[in-house]
Structure formats: structure tokens, C-alpha cells
Regions:
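Amphipathic alpha-helical segments
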Residues: 54-69, 139-145, 237-254, 336-344
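Amphipathic N-proximal alpha-helical interface segments
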Residues: 97-99, 105-107, 181-183, 279-297, ...
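Vicinal oxygen chelate
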Residues: 1-39, 41-53, 70-75, 82-95, 110-142, 167-170, 225-236, ...
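Long, well-ordered mid-to-C-terminal structural blocks that present hydrophobic/aromatic surfaces
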Residues: 248, 252-325
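Hydrophobic, helix-prone linear segments
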Residues: 38-43, 50-104
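Charge-rich interaction segments
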Residues: 204-212, 222-227, 231-245
Length: 415
């Protein structure tokens, strides 16, 4: 049965403006009439950049905390590039590392504007790559919709402009790029990521040790794949960020919920072209309900707004789904995964929130920010067939825990 995005009624209690509702429908109509809907497929990759010298440590972290494993490595004029994969039908993960510590481009400049991002000026979630039947036609259509794309003279990194991908400019609203690719990501020779390289044996041994730990503790069948990813934006830019993403993708606006305890909202966009969100993970935008200067009248919590003021508009966390079930150790699978990772030295922001008894529900937890990517890793277990991405009480607890870890103390302002 074909999904009808035009007649779909978004879920949730977050009220959107008449402007948002009008243009949400207009965007759906234009995607279809322009041919964009027919050209776009599921999300095929996510891209992250780390600082020079951090790539191997970050790869070890990824091996420990999730299902991604190295498929190939490349070297371009400016970067080492690592292609990781999990299941064939799930998006790939591309990690970029500048060849020199002095490397500077638009990511560096963007990070330097924010006090808690400046310490890792080249570390950033870059964006997603969507499958395209004809990426140049996608670019042509989107440029006619006032979406800007990078060309080779506009940025130093050849992955952005001279590879098999075409990438948009970083969004003014989210800081994220969106890329498009018509080639098979398993055809490494066609990707144009640079010269393929072999990693030193000592690096491969490090990765093998982490992989062996994961297999010995049976983490690999439990942590299944990317479930969703959440970008934090400013209060006044929530609707614009969502509408821009809908313009550039084939996702639909699934729904939005107020998280009153944290004075924020969670806004979810999903792909209708897949039956499993892990094949094309949901895109979530979170934002404060009021800007900081207005919020000061009532002194309400504002950890989401504070994050943007301290780190900038950017991806906040990537969430892995944990297979639902009772572990042999007498606890839920997510509790076992988290306990095992804690014993290995992985730090978490709080205890697992939520409960799984006899009714459908969720258990979730946030790790602390990665020292390499600045991203938080979330684990989520949907118990008894729970449908959805969160409960309000879980999100409130997770947001509060993250907010305590994301403060910037200066002068008389503690945010």
C-alpha cells in the first residue's frame, strides 16, 4: 500500500504555525511535480569528520559502541577517508581525518564561533548522503528551489566536490550538509574518495582486538544499526530547519511533541520508502520552545538552546537500536549492553531511563560526548513492539542529563 504523505496527519501535541503547514504541503507537491520524489532513494551514508590524529581512536570507539566495521580506507590531497559498513541494507559511515593538524576549511570556521566546539575545530558531523538515480538532475532541481551546492573552487576537501557525491552547502539552520550519490557505495573504485590505502598492521590489530571483545561479549547481534539522529537548532529556526530538510529529501514530517519539563520539542521526520527505519534512519530536530533572552523572564530550563549557543547548530546524537529481549544475565538487552560498555570504560550521562514490563515501552540512555566526534551515542530498546522514538518522560530525563554535561561557565552566565 502506497504511503500518502499529502493526507497523512502528523502525530503529537506540538502546534506548528499556519506557515509551516502551508509550506509542508507545498513542498510535498513540488517534490512530486518536479520529479525529485522519483529520483531520491533511502539514506546511504552518514559522514563525520574528526581532528588530525583522532581517526584510529574514533574507529576503535565505533567498533566498541556499534556495528560499523572498516570496509576500505583512502587518502586524498587533504584527508584520510575511512568507509565503514554494517548490514548491506543499512547506511554506510564515512569518517574523514585531515592529513595535517593545521587544516582549515568551513568546518573549522564554523566550529570556532562556539566556545565548546572550538576546542575540536575540525570535529563535526558533516551530513547524510541519499541515493539518487541521477545526482546531477537532483542538484539541478534543488538549485531551482534555491538550495546551494558546493563546486570544486569553493572548498578544499575533494570529498565534498570532486568525489562521486554532490553536496549542498552547510545548512544555515542546522549546520548539516546533504549529499547525493548515484553509484553503489560498495563499488569503492567508483567513489572517488582518493587512493585506496592499507592501514598499518598495528592499527588493524587494535581494531581486531575491539572487534573480538564485541564478539566475545555478544554485543554484535544486540546493537543493530542507526535508528535515528537528532540535530539541535535554535528555538526560532525549528520550522525552517524541518522544511528545508523536507525540501531536500524524500522524508515526511512524522510528528512533534512538546517536552514541557525541558521547555523544548522533539520533531521527527521519517522515510516512507523503507519498512525498517534502520535502512534510512529518522531525522529528528530538537529546539527550545522560547529563545534564551525571552526564556530569562520565566527562568525555565533550556538545555537545548544552551547546547546550540555553546556548540552551534549541529548534530547532537546518533541513536542505535538495541534488539528487544531479556538477556541471559537477567536484565534487558540494553542494560546488558550498557553495563558491558561501562566495564570497558565507556562513560554515560545517567542511568538507563524507561522501563520494560508487560506493556510496550522504551528504554534509552545517552553516552557522554565522544572525545573525537563530539557526538553522543544513544541506545534505545523498543520493548514489546513499541512504536515511536521516545516517551516524554524519557526525553526529559535524557535532555536534562545532557544539559548538565554541556554547560559553559563564563562571567555571571552559567549555560
Amino acid at each position: 500500500m502506497t504511503f500518502d504523505e499529502m493526507s497523512y496527519q502528523p502525530l503529537g501535541d506540538k502546534k506548528n504555525s499556519a506557515f509551516f503547514e502551508e509550506y509542508r504541503q507545498k513542498i510535498y507537491e513540488r517534490r512530486k511535480s518536479s520529479g525529485l520524489s522519483e529520483l531520491l532513494g533511502p539514506m546511504r551514508a552518514v559522514v563525520v569528520q574528526v581532528e588530525h590524529g583522532d581517526a584510529v581512536s574514533y574507529l576503535c570507539e565505533l567498533y566498541l559502541m556499534g556495528p560499523y566495521r572498516l570496509a576500505a580506507a583512502f587518502e586524498s590531497e587533504t584527508h584520510r577517508v575511512f568507509l565503514l559498513k554494517s548490514k548491506p541494507e543499512f547506511p554506510r559511515l564515512i569518517v574523514m581525518e585531515p592529513l595535517v593538524s593545521e587544516y582549515r576549511d568551513e568546518i573549522t570556521l564554523l566550529n570556532s564561533l562556539y566556545p565548546l566546539a572550538a576546542a575540536k575545530p575540525n570535529a563535526r558531523y558533516v551530513g547524510e548522503v541519499f541515493a539518487a538515480l541521477d545526482q546531477l538532475e537532483v542538484r539541478r532541481i534543488l538549485e531551482s528551489h534555491s538550495i546551494r551546492f558546493n563546486y570544486h573552487h569553493e572548498t578544499k576537501n575533494p570529498l565534498i566536490t570532486d568525489s562521486a557525491f554532490v553536496f549542498s552547502f552547510p545548512s544555515d539552520y542546522s549546520g548539516n550538509r546533504i549529499g547525493y550519490c548515484q553509484v553503489d557505495l560498495d563499488d569503492v573504485d567508483a567513489l572517488g574518495l582518493g587512493t585506496q590505502i592499507q592501514l598499518p598492521s598495528e592499527v588493524l590489530s587494535q581494531l581486531d582486538l575491539v572487534d573480538e571483545f564485541s564478539r566475545q561479549h555478544r554485543l554484535d547481534p544486540l546493537v543493530m544499526g542507526l535508528d535515528h539522529m537528532a540535530t539541535r537548532v535554535l528555538a526560532g529556526e525549528r520550522e525552517d530547519a524541518i522544511l528545508e530538510f523536507l525540501t531536500m529529501s524524500n522524508y515526511y514530517f512524522w510528528g512533534a511533541y512538546n517536552i514541557a519539563d525541558m521547555n523544548s520539542s522533539t520533531n521527527v521526520n521519517r522515510s516512507s520508502s523503507v519498512e525498517d527505519d534502520k535502512q534510512s534512519p529518522a531525522k529528528v530536530f530538537t529546539a527550545n520552545n522560547t529563545p534564551s533572552f525571552v526564556n530569562s523572564f520565566d527562568d525555565l530550563p533550556m538545555p537545548t538552546e544552551d547546547f546550540v549557543r555553546n556548540f552551534g547548530r549541529r548534530m547532537h546524537h546518533l541513536a542505535y537500536e538495541v534488539c528487544d529481549g531479556d538477556h541471559g544475565s537477567g536484565e534487558k538487552n540494553v542494560d546488558y549492553v550498557v553495563g558491558t560498555l561501562k566495564e570497558k570504560g565507556v562513560a554515560f550521562l545517567a542511568n538507563v531511563v524507561g522501563e520494560c514490563l508487560d506493556e510496550p515501552n522504551l528504554k534509552q540512555i545517552f553516552s557522554k560526548h565522544s572525545a573525537y566526534s563530539i557526538l553522543i551515542t544513544e541506545y534505545v530498546e523498543r520493548c514489546h513492539g513499541y512504536e515511536g522514538f521516545f516517551t516524554k518522560s524519557n526525553v526529559a530525563a535524557l535532555t536534562a542529563a545532557a544539559g548538565q554535561d554541556e554547560q559553559y561557565r563564563h562571567g555571571r552566565v552559567f549555560d
